[in-house]
């Protein structure tokens, strides 16, 4: 059984209220898969990371020993199993042809979205690439809202009009379908935090395949020039589509790509290292040190997208080795057992509850209606409320939309 935290309401006006109401029905705080919090869950526990967890560039690496609470460790485990179950549901729905078009899974990479979110606050902003399902969930969207969007349903986070690559949530600026295009937007989010004197930073994530894009380096330059609180995060999952990193990049130490920006390489398969590095990066940027480049070394178990089997450019033995030796969920489970935070039976109960919850969310998403077959939908959510132009042209003159009338300008 799942108990959900209350989600605070979001304030909006006019047509944005429709967006907020639609989203709020599908939003919840981070899941608490257990029925209740056990006594002592707020007790501090000592975490000792291996020396191989970090490698620094122009900075001293974070402390390898730190303290966190039992409840925080349990929450990260529960979050990761929800994200994985959600991605597995995506795979099944895609094979059933209920999800169509592009769809990119993050199975194997769950530690990054979960570790970052548990290390930052809701004041901070996140933007990433098209592999964004887990980030959307972690920023506050319910599983059913993510899945409904992937299936093109009206109750999706983008009302069924965005699909897999264009998911949004409060404080989460997408999903971006253009390789590397989210990085300058992430720098812009950091500029907004700085301009408004907020104690917050932005996390802009991109893959090793996007790391050679010119706009990434342009963003580095501007962020350093203006000393922005920007955390640039390379999710190095070893392959850009089907191309190994060494075949596309002259230098594969992506954490050093900032040149004049300090960097940190992180074991992205260990959520305890991801969590510590993400907290370190946030503290670094909001303390006035300017931007930082993180490289999360990770691995995707599946192909680049659902249509890619993922075995033509790497061996099955390689994939199995990563699954058996480096799985982030299995790694955290081992720590929970060793630290006495959870028993095998309790972990099995969490896994069972996560499976049940995601199955229920799949049913809700699948039962949701598709967007109405009417042209007026095309003119919704185009402008920030209050900034609309008087009219917006359609394909033909009679398709021109009048925002004041909320109908077509030249139709009776």
Swiss-Prot record:
Chain sites annotated for binding Mg(2+) = 208, 237, 239
For this chain's UniProt record, which GO biological process terms are given? pyruvate decarboxylation to acetyl-CoA
Q: Where does thiamine diphosphate bind?
A: 130-131, 177, 179, 208-210, 237, 304
Q: Name one GO cellular component term.
A: mitochondrial matrix
Enumerate the residues binding pyruvate: 104, 130-131, 169, 177, 179, 208-210, 237, 239
Q: Which reaction does it catalyse?
A: N(6)-[(R)-lipoyl]-L-lysyl-[protein] + pyruvate + H(+) = N(6)-[(R)-S(8)-acetyldihydrolipoyl]-L-lysyl-[protein] + CO2
Q: Which InterPro entries match?
A: DH_E1, PDH_E1_Alpha_Subunit, Pyrv_DH_E1_asu_subgrp-y, THDP-binding
- Coiled-coil region(s): none
Per UniProt, the enzyme's principal EC class comes to oxidoreductase
Where this protein primarily resides, as one coarse class?
A: mitochondrion
Obligatory cofactor(s): thiamine diphosphate; Mg(2+)
Enzyme Commission number, as recorded: 1.2.4.1
List the subcellular locations.
Answer: Mitochondrion matrix
Is Transport a UniProt keyword of this protein? no
**GO function terms (MF aspect):** metal ion binding; pyruvate dehydrogenase (acetyl-transferring) activity
Per the entry, what this protein does is: The pyruvate dehydrogenase complex catalyzes the overall conversion of pyruvate to acetyl-CoA and CO(2). It contains multiple copies of three enzymatic components: pyruvate dehydrogenase (E1), dihydrolipoamide acetyltransferase (E2) and lipoamide dehydrogenase (E3).
Q: How does it assemble?
A: Tetramer of 2 alpha and 2 beta subunits.
What's the protein here called? Pyruvate dehydrogenase E1 component subunit alpha, mitochondrial
């Amino acid at each position: 059984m799942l108990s959900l935290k209350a989600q605070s309401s979001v304030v909006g006006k006019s047509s944005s209220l429709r967006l907020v109401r639609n989203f709020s029905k599908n939003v919840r705080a981070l899941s608490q898969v257990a029925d209740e919090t056990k006594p002592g869950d707020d007790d501090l526990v000592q975490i000792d990371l291996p020396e191989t967890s970090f490698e620094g560039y122009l900075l001293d690496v974070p402390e390898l020993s730190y303290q966190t609470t039992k409840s925080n460790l349990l929450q990260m485990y529960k979050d990761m199993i929800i994200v994985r179950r959600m991605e597995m549901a995506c795979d099944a729905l895609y094979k059933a042809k209920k999800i169509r078009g592009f769809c990119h899974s993050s199975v194997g990479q769950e530690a990054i979205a979960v570790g970052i979110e548990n290390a930052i606050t809701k004041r901070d902003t996140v933007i990433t690439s098209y592999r964004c399902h887990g980030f959307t969930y972690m920023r506050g969207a319910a599983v059913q809202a993510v899945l409904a969007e992937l299936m093109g349903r009206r109750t999706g986070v983008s009302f069924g009009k965005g699909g897999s690559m264009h998911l949004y949530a409060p404080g989460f600026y997408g999903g971006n379908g253009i390789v590397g295009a989210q990085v300058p937007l992430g720098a812009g989010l950091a500029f907004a935090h700085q301009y408004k004197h907020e104690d917050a930073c932005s996390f802009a994530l991109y893959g090793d395949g996007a790391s050679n894009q010119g706009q990434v380096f342009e963003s580095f330059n501007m962020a350093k020039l203006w000393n922005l609180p920007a955390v640039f995060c390379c999710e190095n999952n070893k392959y850009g589509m089907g191309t190994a990193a060494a075949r596309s990049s002259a230098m594969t130490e992506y954490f050093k790509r900032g040149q004049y920006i300090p960097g940190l390489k992180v074991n992205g398969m260990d959520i305890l290292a991801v969590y510590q590095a993400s907290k370190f990066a946030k503290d670094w940027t909001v303390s006035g040190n300017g931007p930082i480049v993180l490289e999360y070394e990770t691995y995707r178990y599946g192909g680049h997208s659902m249509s890619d089997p993922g075995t033509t450019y790497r061996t099955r033995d390689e994939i199995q080795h990563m699954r058996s030796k480096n799985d982030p969920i299995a790694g955290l489970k081992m720590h929970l057992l060793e630290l006495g935070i959870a028993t095998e039976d309790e972990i099995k109960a969490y896994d069972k509850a996560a499976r049940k919850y995601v199955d229920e969310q799949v049913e809700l998403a699948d039962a949701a209606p598709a967007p109405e077959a009417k042209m007026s939908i095309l003119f919704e959510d185009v402008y920030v409320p209050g900034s609309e132009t008087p009219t917006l042209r359609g394909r033909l003159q009679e398709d021109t939309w009048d925002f004041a009338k909320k109908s077509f300008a030249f139709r009776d």
